[in-house]
């Protein structure tokens, strides 16, 4: 597992640069599309802003990219301002050159949630699997809506949300926890781990314990982030604030071996060089 330390609030920028790098290396075509797994939430917003910039400036195209989002609230229509459909189109898809037929998001209003989840997994297999899955992490270490205690063998399914997650997410619902959906459709831990690469972005002091548990402690189903230790090509990129609970030796070790990769401004500059 790789671990990259960036400046504060720059993990999302690093993620954007890495997406561009991987798509360019893949060199997608209409016959061979790049498959990207995408998150929602606060941390990825800057990543999407940066990717929109790169797209408008001709640095990258999404015409031959297929996307699968991680999750969606149960019971929210696509037009609801807090649905992840609304989030993705408003903050990303409406501003880039992606073919909307290549966008895949779970339907929180489906008549049969089990069937919706089964078809989602089936479609991922049909396109050859996910090449790169992006994600954030919750304060309790959850990825997507794989809350503490989620099976590492889990697949896309409906998942009940913990009280902590509902309270945290209430900030998007006028701080009214009664308006927050009680469950969501989410890709499973195995769905994420099956991706060829996984990149998790961690920003802020409130994520410091989750980062510590994911990197320095053993694999534990109560900390979903720790499953990444089992992935052959997992990357965690975190800002300085998120490193607050790491051992000094761990911090210094990764800063040293990844010293060529944490100067985000230099990495962005390199994208503009032909």
Curated annotation (Swiss-Prot):
InterPro entries: Glc/Gal-6P_isomerase (IPR006148), Glucosamine6P_isomerase (IPR004547), Glucosamine6P_isomerase_CS (IPR018321), NagB/RpiA_transferase-like (IPR037171). SUPFAM superfamilies: NagB/RpiA/CoA transferase-like. It is an enzyme of class 3 (hydrolase). GO terms for cellular component: cytoplasm. Pathway: Amino-sugar metabolism; N-acetylneuraminate degradation; D-fructose 6-phosphate from N-acetylneuraminate: step 5/5. It comes from the Bacteria. GO terms for biological process: carbohydrate metabolic process; glucosamine catabolic process; N-acetylglucosamine catabolic process; N-acetylneuraminate catabolic process. The active site is at 71 (proton acceptor), 140 (for ring-opening step), 142 (proton acceptor), 147 (for ring-opening step). Its EC number is 3.5.99.6. The keyword Hydrolase applies. Keywords: Carbohydrate metabolism, Hydrolase. It catalyses: alpha-D-glucosamine 6-phosphate + H2O = beta-D-fructose 6-phosphate + NH4(+). The keyword Transmembrane helix does not apply. Pfam families: Glucosamine_iso. One of its GO terms (molecular function) is identical protein binding. Belongs to the glucosamine/galactosamine-6-phosphate isomerase family. NagB subfamily. HAMAP family: GlcN6P_deamin. Catalyzes the reversible isomerization-deamination of glucosamine 6-phosphate (GlcN6P) to form fructose 6-phosphate (Fru6P) and ammonium ion. This is Glucosamine-6-phosphate deaminase. It comes from Fusobacterium nucleatum subsp. nucleatum (strain ATCC 25586 / DSM 15643 / BCRC 10681 / CIP 101130 / JCM 8532 / KCTC 2640 / LMG 13131 / VPI 4355).
């Amino acid at each position: 597992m790789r671990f990259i330390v960036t400046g504060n609030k720059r993990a999302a920028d690093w993620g954007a640069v890495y997406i561009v790098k991987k798509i360019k290396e893949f060199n997608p075509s209409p016959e061979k599309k790049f498959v990207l797994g995408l998150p929602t939430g606060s941390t990825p917003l800057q990543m999407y802003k940066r990717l929109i910039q790169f797209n408008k400036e001709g640095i990258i195209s999404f015409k031959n990219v297929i996307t699968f989002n991680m999750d969606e609230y149960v019971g929210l229509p696509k037009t609801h301002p807090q649905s992840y459909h609304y989030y993705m189109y408003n903050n990303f898809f409406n501003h880039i050159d992606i073919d909307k037929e290549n966008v895949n998001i779970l339907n929180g209003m489906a008549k049969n949630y089990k069937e919706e989840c089964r078809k989602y997994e089936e479609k991922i297999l049909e396109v050859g699997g996910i090449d790169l899955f992006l994600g954030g992490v919750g304060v309790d270490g959850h990825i997507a809506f794989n809350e503490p205690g989620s099976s590492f063998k889990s697949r896309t399914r409906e998942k009940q949300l913990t009280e902590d997650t509902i309270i945290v997410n209430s900030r998007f619902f006028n701080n009214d926890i009664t308006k927050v959906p009680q469950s969501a459709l989410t890709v499973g831990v195995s769905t994420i781990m099956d991706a060829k690469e996984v990149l998790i972005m961690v920003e802020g002091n409130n994520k410091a314990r989750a980062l510590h548990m994911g990197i320095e402690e053993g694999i534990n189903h109560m900390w979903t982030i720790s499953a990444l230790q089992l992935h052959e090509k997992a990357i965690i990129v975190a800002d300085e604030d998120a490193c607050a609970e790491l051992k000094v030796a761990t911090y210094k070790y990764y800063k040293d071996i990844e010293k060529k990769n944490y100067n985000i401004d230099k990495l962005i500059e390199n994208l503009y060089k032909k």
